[in-house]
């Protein structure tokens, strides 16, 4: 066990505890905590030169739990009252399967400067921040979440986004300069604006913005898939 694998295990523990609690609010906070551990385990692995195949596999398995199963379970528990639980379960299965498929693809593809398909942590963070937002009456998203059609569509949309071949820019390349740095800077500026003006909706809005910027700044010169 090294420091990177310890952080990955804490990511896994966060997702598992979120599932055990079954509370959309507290569980979503644990998913966000897991995302923080997930962010740092890669940096620590590269810094300590401990980024071997075992750590990579462990990281993906942890991500399936924290960014696939946990958001799916919590989203299911937060379904609209008038919605048949069977339909909620079906779309959650698609979300979890889409996350697992995305991470399996991630593991077998060569390294790239961009992601092919929405990264699973972005999907997990969307649902975590969405579920936190709807706990507050003044949130924009309460009415949207209460709409069964929108509720059912969101997991299907994100399952598809994670597995399309379109590129999404990676935080690993934040050091780029000139026009290549524009999507990163735009995302930072707009996310800061969301936090200041609409803090309850900042998380989902930031993920939507990330998706939109990836489409606008489509890196057509990237032809390989990400690791």
Residue ranges of each PLM-predicted region?
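Helical transmembrane-bundle signal
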Residues: 11, 15-18, 70-73, 95-102, ...
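Hydrophobic alpha-helical transmembrane segments of polytopic
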Residues: 7, 27-34, 91-94, 98, ...
């Amino acid at each position: 066990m090294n420091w990177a694998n310890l952080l990955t295990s804490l990511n896994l523990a966060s997702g598992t505890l979120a599932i055990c609690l079954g509370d959309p609010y507290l569980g979503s906070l644990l998913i966000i905590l897991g995302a923080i551990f997930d962010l740092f385990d890669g940096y620590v692995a590269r810094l300590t030169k401990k980024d071997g195949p075992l750590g990579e596999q462990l990281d993906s398995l942890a991500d399936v739990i924290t960014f696939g199963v946990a958001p799916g379970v919590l989203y299911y528990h937060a379904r609209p009252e008038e919605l048949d639980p069977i339909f909620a379960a079906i779309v959650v299965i698609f979300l979890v399967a889409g996350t697992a498929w995305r991470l399996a693809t991630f593991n077998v593809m060569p390294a790239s400067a961009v992601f092919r398909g929405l990264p699973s942590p972005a999907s997990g963070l969307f649902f975590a921040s969405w579920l936190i937002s709807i706990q507050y009456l003044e949130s924009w998203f309460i009415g949207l979440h209460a709409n069964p059609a929108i509720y059912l569509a969101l997991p299907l949309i994100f399952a598809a986004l994670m597995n399309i071949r379109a590129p999404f820019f990676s935080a690993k390349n934040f050091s780029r300069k000139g026009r290549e740095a524009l999507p990163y800077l735009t995302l930072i500026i707009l996310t800061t604006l969301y936090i200041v003006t609409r803090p309850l909706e900042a998380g989902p809005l930031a993920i939507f913005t990330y998706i939109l910027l990836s489409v606008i700044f489509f890196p057509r010169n990237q032809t390989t898939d990400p690791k």
